[in-house]
């Protein structure tokens, strides 16, 4: 997330005219009360026009003060003056003060050349009129010894006349922050209310406040890691700084570290506890953030909407409404009945709120993030609060699931039970109208607008690249991800490199992938980082990192040696080149695994479920032993193995045909097909049907690999390891071997070369496999002219 320049041109027309194609006018696909359309009282959203609101003498606005002596170490006060004085003026409940965020939005409406210059009275009056403020506060400050002198003027916006002037001296740098309390009293020419705590910026330390300002600026441009660094520094300097706790909670909300959720809650709670001296608006925003962090999104929305009702231009409050509606859209409230649920939030309202934020401030980049999040997934899944013992979320009959269906320019999202008839109907409806494709395309348009608005900010490039991968446009994805510079935040650089590693795997670019892997290795900090690095290293024949991770996880979880050894076999099984001893390790693990021996494979209580990797992805290996399959399996990934164990060729063929059909259907709507074709391919090889196997291999490599590919195998328990990348070399190698066996030598050469490219620097453990591939490639002879 590289630092970006503030955008001064209007937001791209595509975003303002048809943001996502999802406007508040079409929020009826999910009514405010969660019921299906039509909704009572629904009204069309009106397009914004730059019409000045009516001036009110009870509305005040503070614009940046002028550094009259141009003292470099006081430059920070130019923008800080707005925040500091606004906070102190905001203690009075009988006046309204335009928040500093909105002041920044209005400043961007000035000609670019004027923004960096000292503001004239005409500039100030124009800004005040745009905000409907009848009272304008402008000021100058001068270096006086070690401190500063402030001369602050109050103007009547209607007449342009100065109403009063206030002068205040601060003796030293540490007293600068405290200067704004007496300035506020002088500006208002009124005694403070009895319960007001003036000077309530939340800190008395200038250095802490400066770190807070830098952190807030970074957060607004979505440089999350940078924001976290500065905000933590602010709290290290002053642990009681409520506003720094609040902004750090917001920043932690966007991080991916496992402990970030706990940190978000802790900082939101600290901000709430320390916020007693802050103005009512800031206290309300903090309490809304605490509610979001606590999962109380309806309460958060209630508080944020109160702020919006008071000030319809309060960007931060509007953004908070979008946040709580978005997260509430992943929570189930009181269900309509046993088969039909109701979300606590509404994604159409969330999109409308984020749309409003971006119309007011195109540089408020976090508003882009959740819009993309809402349009990217095919479904919303809500696991039960009280899960069925021993049953995973996806298999739990109490799970709620909602297919994200696009209807015109809105989303229709209704949670139903996965076991009920409505889920299938939703999926068919979404397939028929290509909801997934249209939503991804809409999300990409938003990401493109975000890239423009942020002037190629790193986070926007990351999301654009990810969406292009999901749409199968690898060249465009790589182009976007390559633009993420070394000055971007570490988190964004790591994610960008991971996506580029996937592209390199899909393109069979071994040398390029190894360079990216080396770059990723230099950015590793956390345990999660090392696990993800190991997951990607598998593709390039690097097994030692994944073996180290498995041994560490096994030791931490006290796995029996048999489980550790079997898990060490899994990477090669997924690559399609299993070690010859894996069958022995498989049986040894099954004998000591916990759970029932006669049961439905796929259930967590069944010991055979532990053998999913080898039973599903090494089904073509000749066996002398099978675990018991006398009970029907729970989950399709075991069905081919069950059919083979029972010598039931018809059952195997039936499973393969279902998988092949489902894979094609998923691909048509760009849904992750969970390695259905890879499973079917293994079954075809197991029954000796080479022509069918080649057909599956060609579909997998030509049609599926250009898209985001899902292996359908979860990660190692207790860690972030996942095996999705291993599918690329596996499918390429199978394609090469099948083409060679059926006489397509030229095609076989192509696919052997791709595998050899990926494994150009494979570990010693894989070198015998690499030698065998080279020999098979050489046996094909030279290419035909």
Language-model segment annotations:
Residues 29-95, 103, 204:
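A structural "domain/chain start" motif
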Residues 34, 39-49, 83-88, 101-223, ...:
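Catalytic-center loop of serine/cysteine hydrolases
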Residues 206, 213, 247, 286, ...:
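"A position-specific structural signal for the A-helix of alpha-solenoid helical repeats
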Residues 208-441, 445, 711-724:
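Short coil/linker segments at helix-helix boundaries
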Residues 218, 252, 291, 325, ...:
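Residue at a conserved register position within TPR or TPR-like alpha-solenoid repeats
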Residues 244, 317, 367, 425-426, ...:
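TPR alpha-solenoid repeat register
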């Amino acid at each position: 997330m590289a630092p970006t320049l503030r955008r001064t041109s209007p937001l791209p027309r595509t975003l303002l005219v048809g943001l996502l194609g999802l406007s508040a006018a079409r929020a009826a696909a999910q009514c405010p009360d969660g019921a299906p359309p039509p909704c009572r009282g629904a009204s069309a959203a009106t397009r914004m026009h730059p019409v000045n609101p009516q001036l009110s003498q009870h509305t005040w606005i503070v614009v940046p003060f002028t550094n009259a002596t141009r003292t470099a170490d006081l430059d920070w006060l130019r923008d800080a003056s707005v925040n500091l004085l606004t906070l102190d003026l905001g203690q009075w409940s009988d006046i309204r003060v335009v928040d500093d965020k909105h002041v920044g939005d209005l400043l961007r409406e000035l000609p670019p050349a004027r923004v960096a210059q000292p503001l004239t009275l005409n500039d100030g009056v124009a800004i005040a009129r745009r905000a409907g403020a009848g009272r304008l506060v402008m000021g100058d400050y001068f270096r006086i010894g070690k401190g500063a002198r402030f001369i602050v003027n109050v103007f009547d916006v209607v007449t342009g006349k100065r109403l009063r002037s206030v002068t205040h001296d601060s003796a030293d740098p540490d007293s600068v922050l405290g200067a704004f309390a007496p300035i506020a009293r002088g500006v208002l020419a009124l005694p403070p209310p009895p319960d007001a705590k003036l000077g309530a910026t939340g800190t008395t330390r200038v250095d802490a406040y400066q770190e807070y300002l830098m952190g807030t600026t970074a957060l607004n441009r979505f440089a999350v890691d940078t924001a976290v660094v500065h905000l933590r520094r602010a709290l290290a300097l002053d642990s009681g700084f409520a506003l720094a706790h609040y902004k750090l909670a917001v920043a932690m909300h966007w991080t991916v570290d496992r402990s970030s959720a706990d940190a978000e809650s802790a900082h939101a709670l600290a901000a709430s506890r320390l916020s007693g001296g802050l103005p009512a608006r800031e206290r309300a925003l903090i309490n809304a953030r605490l509610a979001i962090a606590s999962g109380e999104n309806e309460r958060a929305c209630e508080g944020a909407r109160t702020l919006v009702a008071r000030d319809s231009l309060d960007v931060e409050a509007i953004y908070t409404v979008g946040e709580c509606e978005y997260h509430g859209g992943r929570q189930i409230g009181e269900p309509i009945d046993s088969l039909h649920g109701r979300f606590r939030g509404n994604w159409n309202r969330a999109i409308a709120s984020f749309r409003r934020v971006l119309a007011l401030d195109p540089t408020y980049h976090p508003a882009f993030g959740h819009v993309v999040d809402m349009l990217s997934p095919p479904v919303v899944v809500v696991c039960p609060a009280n899960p069925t013992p021993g049953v995973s979320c996806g298999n739990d009959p109490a799970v709620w699931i909602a297919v994200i269906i696009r209807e015109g320019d809105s989303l229709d999202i209704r949670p139903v039970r996965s076991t009920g008839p409505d889920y299938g109907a939703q999926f068919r409806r979404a397939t028929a109208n290509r909801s997934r494709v249209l939503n991804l395309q809409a999300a990409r348009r938003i990401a493109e607008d975000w890239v423009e608005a942020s002037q190629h900010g790193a986070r926007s490039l990351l999301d654009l690249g990810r969406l292009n991968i999901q749409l199968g446009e690898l060249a465009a994805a790589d182009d976007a991800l390559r633009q993420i510079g070394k000055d971007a935040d570490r988190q964004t650089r790591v994610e960008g490199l991971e996506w580029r590693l996937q592209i390199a795997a899909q393109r069979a670019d071994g040398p390029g992938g190894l360079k990216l892997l080396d770059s990723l290795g230099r950015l590793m900090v956390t345990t999660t980082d090392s696990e993800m690095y190991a997951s990607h290293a598998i593709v390039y024949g690097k097994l030692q990192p994944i073996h180290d991770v498995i041994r560490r996880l096994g030791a931490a979880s006290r796995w029996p040696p048999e489980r550790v050894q079997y898990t060490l076999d899994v990477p090669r099984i997924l690559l399609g080149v299993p070690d010859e001893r894996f069958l022995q390790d498989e049986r040894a693990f099954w004998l000591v695994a916990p759970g029932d021996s006669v049961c439905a494979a796929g259930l967590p209580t069944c010991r055979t479920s532990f053998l999913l990797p080898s039973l599903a992805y090494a089904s073509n290996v000749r066996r002398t032993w099978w675990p018991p399959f006398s009970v029907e399996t729970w989950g399709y990934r075991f069905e081919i193995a069950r059919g083979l164990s029972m010598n039931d060729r018809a059952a195997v063929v039936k499973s393969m045909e279902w998988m092949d059909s489902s894979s094609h259907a998923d691909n048509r709507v760009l849904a992750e097909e969970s390695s259905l074709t890879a499973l079917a391919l293994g079954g075809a090889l197991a029954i000796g049907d080479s022509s069918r196997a080649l057909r599956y291999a060609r579909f997998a490599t030509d049609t599926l690999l250009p898209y985001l590919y899902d292996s359908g195998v979860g990660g190692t328990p207790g860690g972030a390891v996942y095996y999705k990348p291993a599918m690329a070399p596996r499918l390429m190698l199978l394609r090469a071997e099948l083409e060679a066996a059926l006489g397509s030598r030229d095609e076989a050469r192509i696919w052997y070369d791709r595998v050899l490219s990926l494994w150009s620097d494979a570990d010693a453990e894989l070198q015998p496999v690499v030698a065998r591939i080279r020999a098979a490639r050489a046996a094909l002879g030279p290419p035909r002219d």
